[in-house]
Amino acid sequence: MAKKMKLSDITNMFAGMDVEALEGVTIEGDIEIDLGGLGGGFDPMLAAALGQESAVLAQHFARIAGMFGYPVGIGAPAAPAISPALAAPKLKDLIPAKFDVANIAEWATQIQEVPIGNTSADGGSRGKRVLVGGEKALPFFPDAPMPNRNQVTIDVFDMRIGLAKAVKENYDEVMDSPGEWAKKNVEKFNADMITIHLISTDPLVKDTPPKEAAKTVEEVLQAVDVPIAIGGSGNPQKDPEVLARAAEVAEGERCLLASASLNLDYAAIAEAALKYDHDVLSWTQLDMNAQKELNRKLMKQCNVPRDRIIMDPTTAALGYGLDYAYTNMERIRLAALMGDDELTFPMSSGTTNAWGARESWMVGSPLKEDSDWGPREYRGPIWEIVTGLSLAIAGNDLFMMMHPTSVAVLKQITQTLFGTIDTEQVDIANWIGAEV
């Protein structure tokens, strides 16, 4: 085998010699390019391209050598041309495929079904009972039918508060009467439930006594016959007392007490729920492990039955962390379906949080160079709709909402997917040229 030399070896060999020119001397050899570092195999097309480029490189070396007086032959053979790739045959038909509903073995656990509201047959006065949960698969998947559709509860407050203009114009004439507000939500806006927020009980707002706040709950119960959720002000010191008194005046109605959390006396709220026949909303802040901990404490420390717990893992609005809320809810639902019995509960979303995003209610961008945001009368409801629908796909069951248009659109879409609303079939095969 011939000894291999590098061009630098030839230069070094003549470095110590007083040679000005070589006459009658021909240096023969081949130039080799080491491609050993390439991974993933050697493509024939790449080989042809490298051969062509190497031939050009050899010609350059020959010309340079000629400039210095070295005899060289320029007539090197041209590199072989790269053969054009064969044209792919024109596709006439799609590859035939058949979709079969999968039976995912990992989804072995059913989500707990939780009733809200007691009818006369159950010892209460509600006109209907709402059921949430009961799923055996992710929402709207064909793997297992959803036993219960998504439910919407519309917010009512025990005092006049500041609302986005697009929301306020729907309620302005009833905001001083929680009972009339609740009645309008049910009769005109088709609310499945009502959530009464006792925000005036906050010591920094009106510091309304629990006994007086309980009268507002009675007013709402008499005004409507749908199930209700009862919320406090968010004050961790006062909420347990307020919710306990509200639970007492609503005894036997199976309301949803909102909410028990790790930063307040959850045991007092759980005790009131058990004593007066209510459900408990287990609220945490975008933390699946905290949700597991609170659920575990409600079940094992407070002896709350599984069919009385609904989770609220927190809703972050579109543009303000919706991706975190979605991921958290989806992880919770997947873990539950795969057997985590500390998470096998239906979920609730404070979808109204969408109105906390400034993009939902501001007239336009504060930046002069920004683009037009469009009319807020449309933008605001869309913000709430997108927030709600995103979490519906993640597995949420109950939606706390405000704008009547948002409520109508979310119910229309989710009930269409659920199968209770028939819609015109759309040909999706021609989706590129379809007109909306």
UniProtKB/Swiss-Prot annotation:
SUPFAM superfamilies hit by this protein: Dihydropteroate synthetase-like (SSF51717)
Swiss-Prot/TrEMBL keywords: Methanogenesis
Superkingdom of origin organism: Archaea
GO biological process: methanogenesis, from acetate; one-carbon metabolic process
Biological or metabolic pathway of the protein: One-carbon metabolism; methanogenesis from acetate
Pfam families: CdhD
Quaternary structure and interacting proteins, as annotated: Heterodimer of delta and gamma chains. The ACDS complex is made up of alpha, epsilon, beta, gamma and delta chains with a probable stoichiometry of (alpha(2)epsilon(2))(4)-beta(8)-(gamma(1)delta(1))(8).
Family according to the record: Belongs to the CdhD family.
Known function: Part of a complex that catalyzes the reversible cleavage of acetyl-CoA, allowing growth on acetate as sole source of carbon and energy. Probably maintains the overall quaternary structure of the ACDS complex.
Name of the protein in question: Acetyl-CoA decarbonylase/synthase complex subunit delta
Organism encoding this protein: Methanosarcina mazei (strain ATCC BAA-159 / DSM 3647 / Goe1 / Go1 / JCM 11833 / OCM 88)
Gene: cdhD1
